[in-house]
């Protein structure tokens, strides 16, 4: 024997298999508890569908409405919620220990934009050759970045050496 396909979403009209329901009419007014047959008749008279809104209630709450319109509204709500969700990305800014003032300002402007967009920023400071002898210069630069963005960002990962580079991660406040 084959099982019927499982429908997602609320049960409508003849799919509602309970003896009594609490009915809400198409104007949103509570009609009270009644047999399912009377509720189906009322929906048919109005030319609309009987939709089970709260199936776990005792008795289940059913509403008379246009099911197509209802489904459309639900889909619209889901899409709006998805649009409002912001996926936080990790952006990377690469610096050098002996960076020029103007170059630093350009990188700072980019970081500022990333924080306004709600993204985290990974500041990577790469050392080459003899620069490895002076990690304090790198630490000084990362502490300057930390101080410059103290108002709009918090440090998520403190400055620390990893091989030939120093890394710090900042997140927007």
UniProtKB/Swiss-Prot annotation:
- Give any single GO term for biological process: ribosome disassembly
So what does this one do?
A: IF-3 binds to the 30S ribosomal subunit and shifts the equilibrium between 70S ribosomes and their 50S and 30S subunits in favor of the free subunits, thus enhancing the availability of 30S subunits on which protein synthesis initiation begins.
Name the InterPro entries for this protein. T_IF-3_C_sf (IPR036788), T_IF-3_N_sf (IPR036787), Translation_initiation_fac3_CS (IPR019813), Translation_initiation_fac_3 (IPR001288), Translation_initiation_fac_3_C (IPR019815), Translation_initiation_fac_3_N (IPR019814)
Kindly give the SUPFAM superfamilies that the UniProt entry links to this protein. Answer: Translation initiation factor IF3, C-terminal domain, Translation initiation factor IF3, N-terminal domain
Q: In Gene Ontology terms, what is one molecular function of this protein?
A: translation initiation factor activity
Principal location class: cytoplasm
Gene Ontology CC entries for this record = cytosol; membrane
Provide the alphabetized UniProt keywords.
Cytoplasm, Initiation factor, Protein biosynthesis
Q: Which domain of life is it from?
A: Bacteria
Q: Identify the Pfam families for this entry.
A: IF3_C, IF3_N
Q: Where in the cell is it found?
A: Cytoplasm
Q: Which organism is it from?
A: Caulobacter sp. (strain K31)
Q: What is this protein called?
A: Translation initiation factor IF-3
Which family does the similarity line name? Belongs to the IF-3 family.
Q: How does it assemble?
A: Monomer.
């Amino acid at each position: 024997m084959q099982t019927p396909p499982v429908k997602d979403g609320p049960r409508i009209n003849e799919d509602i298999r309970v003896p009594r329901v609490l009915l809400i009419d198409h104007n949103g007014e509570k009609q009270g508890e009644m047999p399912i047959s009377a509720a189906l008749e009322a929906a048919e008279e109005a030319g609309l569908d009987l939709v089970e809104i709260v199936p776990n209630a005792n008795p289940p709450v059913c509403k008379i409405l246009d099911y197509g319109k209802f489904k459309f509204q639900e889909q619209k709500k889901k899409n709006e919620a998805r649009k409002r969700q912001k996926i936080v990305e990790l952006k990377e800014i690469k610096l050098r220990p002996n960076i020029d003032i103007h170059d630093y300002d350009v990188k700072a402007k980019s970081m500022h934009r990333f924080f306004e967009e709600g993204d985290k920023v990974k500041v990577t400071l790469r050392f080459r050759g003899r620069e490895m002898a002076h990690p304090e210069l790198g630490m000084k630069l990362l502490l300057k970045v930390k101080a410059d963005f103290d108002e709009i960002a918090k440090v998520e990962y403190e400055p620390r050496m990893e091989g030939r580079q120093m890394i710090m991660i900042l997140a927007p406040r």
